[in-house]
Structure formats: C-alpha cells, structure tokens
Amino acid sequence: MSGCTVRAARAGDEPGAYHVCLKTGNHGQDGAQLYRDDPDALGRIFVGPYLTLEPELSLVLDDDQGICGYALGALDSRAFYARYESEWRPRLCAAFAEPHGDPTRW
C-alpha cells in the first residue's frame, strides 16, 4: 500500500466511496454482479449517510488511483439513527418508485 493517504472525507468523495462499498458488498467480495441495475445502491444505504450526516467522522483512504477504502463512524449512534430516519431515509425513498404488483412476488 505504498503511497496511500488517510484523509478526511470531503464533498465529491461519494462516487469513489460508493465504488469501494460495491466492490466489497458481497460479504467482502465484489458485489457488482448483484447490483448491476443500481451500482450505487449499497453506497447510498451504507456510506452516504455517514459522509453526509457525520462528515467529521468520515475518513477515506486514497492511493494513486483514487479512493480505495474508508472508515466511517457516528459519535452518538442513537442520534445518528434519528437523523438517518428523519433526513437521509426520506430522501433515499423519494428517489425510488414504490414497487408495483403483488408483494408476495417481489
């Protein structure tokens, strides 16, 4: 890992961090085959909230090819979850249509 740098996450890091999330999203293995229709899905669910709601506790690992890792945290898990539910989740849900048809067939 020569030439790697740990730094505070900043605006614009989402695509790189989401990509890392996808590439490790199948039990640590590449999840790209599972999320072909929406490669950013895992990142929007698991990475985006921290980058947005807890930026001061969001770090990324950079190398010469871009973001290759991250460490994310929340100072207060209960407060973070409350903000996730009131701020992040509604935006996420609003971006996608409700499924149609018989719910037993989803």
Q: What feature does the model see in each segment?
A:
Residues 16-20, 45, 66:
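Alpha-helical elements of Rossmann-like donor-binding domains used by nucleotide-donor carbohydrate transfer enzymes
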Residues 60, 66-75:
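Conserved beta-strand in the GNAT
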